[in-house]
């Protein structure tokens, strides 16, 4: 499985733990909803800045966001 797919699954899991929609996460992280959708499907390779914004929105560390992803 690619890193992008693993990351997308992780973001989807963490988002669902908060019972947030993709739109909720997009608003909290100030990221386009379509971009969140692409990320969760493994179709994007996000920058560190985007990952940081997602982590802050989810109230977790970047390390927690990347936990369990093979290449990290």
Where are these regions (language model features)?
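Short basic helix-loop element that most often maps to the first helix and adjoining turn
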Residues: 9-28
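Short, conserved catalytic or interaction motifs in soluble domains
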Residues: 41, 60, 71
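Short, charged recognition helix plus adjacent turn
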Residues: 64-72
């Amino acid at each position: 499985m690619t890193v992008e797919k693993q990351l997308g699954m992780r973001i989807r899991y963490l988002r669902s733990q908060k019972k947030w929609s993709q739109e909720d996460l997009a608003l909290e992280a100030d990221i386009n909803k379509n971009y969140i959708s692409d990320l969760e499907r493994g179709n994007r390779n996000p920058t560190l800045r985007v990952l940081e914004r997602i982590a802050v929105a989810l109230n977790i560390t970047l390390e927690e966001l990347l936990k369990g992803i093979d290449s990290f």
